[in-house]
Curated annotation (Swiss-Prot):
Keywords: Chaperone, Endoplasmic reticulum, Membrane, Nucleus, Transmembrane, Transmembrane helix. GO terms for cellular component: endoplasmic reticulum; endoplasmic reticulum membrane; nuclear membrane. Acts as a co-chaperone with HSPA8/Hsc70; required to promote protein folding and trafficking, prevent aggregation of client proteins, and promote unfolded proteins to endoplasmic reticulum-associated degradation (ERAD) pathway. Acts by determining HSPA8/Hsc70's ATPase and polypeptide-binding activities. Can also act independently of HSPA8/Hsc70: together with DNAJB12, acts as a chaperone that promotes maturation of potassium channels KCND2 and KCNH2 by stabilizing nascent channel subunits and assembling them into tetramers. The gene is DNAJB14. InterPro entries: DnaJ_domain (IPR001623), DnaJ_domain_CS (IPR018253), DnaJ_subfamily_B/C (IPR051100), DUF1977_DnaJ-like (IPR015399), J_dom_sf (IPR036869). Pfam families: DnaJ, DUF1977. Residues 1-244 are cytoplasmic. This is DnaJ homolog subfamily B member 14. Residues 266-379 are lumenal. The chain crosses the membrane at residues 245-265. One of its GO terms (molecular function) is Hsp70 protein binding.
Length: 379
């Protein structure tokens, strides 16, 4: 099957050369041959363009080389304002078509995002934001834009996950990386499967959702009575191997099982926390109190005042304030990130309504953090 893929790619290259030479019939013939050999998205997209718009002569698109690459032998995609009609009669430009073909031609996740192999989180986020806005199906109606958008999302989902990225780099199988076949299965190692759909990933970046850690009121295990939980999506990987696969899965799950057992044992060995930042009827922590220093409200049970006095009470109130400040700091970070992303999207789309919405965000947690900071300095 992979031999057919190579032959199909050669046919697509011949078709592009024919288009550049103005030979529409030859290009169409080789694209149809490529379709029979292997279902390449680039061949299908080019064939649709020929059938709808005739010859698309010009420089053939190619993957964006990562920064630092010395290869300058390939021509850049030409700018062209020629427009066509996509699905549902919506228009698209030749630039958009070239961009879609460029993405679909990329052979690994790094080429899809246009980053180097040592790119950090910020580089990946910057590259994803730029490409996701450019190729989102609501904005780009060129043939194959949806597949390109999915490919971008899958590439980011893999490279932004340290474990998947490590597994992806170790295989060395970049030729087939991040290409999704028509039968709905990836044709390479399972480490390149995304745990989140491209649309959900887009909503996280531009819809206000942030999968960051959230501080909950107290799990014990240290003197401060606070614990931060990091929520992560977990994907269900497809079973591809038989035989001793069950034993391999068991070995892989052993660290997780050990962690769960240790966590359960630690919970059994730790006493209930003496306070909560929110009323909790289940533990009887419904009596409202306030710290002496910052005036932070917290809730205790009916026996608290008898058990905690003097220095013990001061230690508890110090823990209350530390947990409260941590909570406010995390929420302030989320507010700032949301505002930054909205401003970026408004700039890209030139959307005044979105810009006004970003400017109108109340930033309540950030204001509270400033108030607490001034109290600390004043104290």
């Amino acid at each position: 099957m992979e031999g057919n893929r190579d032959e199909a790619e050669k046919c697509v290259e011949i078709a592009r050369e024919a288009l550049n030479a103005g030979n529409r019939e030859k290009a169409q013939r080789f694209l149809q041959k490529a379709e029979k050999l292997y279902p390449l998205p680039s061949a299908r997209a080019l064939l649709e363009i020929i059938m709808k718009n005739g010859s698309t002569a010009g420089n053939s698109p190619h993957c964006r080389k990562p920064s630092g690459s010395g290869d300058q032998s390939k021509p850049n995609c030409t700018k062209d304002s020629t427009s066509g009609s996509g699905e549902g009669g919506k228009g698209y430009t030749k630039d958009q078509v070239d961009g879609v073909l460029s993405i679909n031609k990329c052979k690994n996740c790094y080429e899809v995002l246009g980053v180097t192999k040592d790119a950090g989180d910020e580089d990946l986020k910057k590259a994803y934001r730029k490409l996701a806005l450019k190729f989102h199906p609501d904005k780009n109606h060129a043939p194959g834009a949806t597949d390109a958008f999915k490919k971008i999302g899958n590439a980011y989902a893999v490279l932004s996950n340290p474990e998947k990225r490590k597994q992806y780099d170790l295989t060395g199988n970049e030729e087939q990386a991040c290409n999704h076949q028509n039968n709905g299965r990836f044709n390479f190692h399972r480490g390149c499967e995304a745990d989140i759909t491209p649309e959900d990933l887009f909503n996280i970046f531009f819809g206000g959702g942030f999968p960051s850690g959230s501080v909950h009121s107290f799990s014990n295990g240290r003197a401060g009575y606070s614990q931060q939980h990091q929520h992560r999506h977990s994907g269900h990987e497809r079973e591809e191997e038989r035989g001793d696969g069950g034993f391999s899965v068991f070995i892989q799950l052993m660290p997780i099982i050990v962690l769960i057992l240790v966590s359960l044992l630690s919970q059994l060995m730790v006493s209930n926390p003496p306070y909560s930042l929110y009323p909790r009827s289940g533990t009887g922590q419904t009596i409202k109190m306030q710290t002496e220093n910052l005036g932070v409200v917290y809730y205790v049970n009916k026996d608290f005042k008898n058990e905690y006095k003097g220095m013990l009470l001061q230690k508890v109130e110090k823990s209350v304030e530390e947990d409260y400040v941590t909570n406010i700091r995390n929420n302030c970070w989320k507010e700032r990130q949301q505002k930054t992303d909205m401003q970026y999207a408004a700039k890209v789309y030139r959307d005044d309504r979105l810009r006004r919405k970003a400017d109108a965000l109340s930033m309540d947690n950030c204001k509270e953090l400033e108030r607490l900071t001034s109290l600390y300095k004043g104290g």
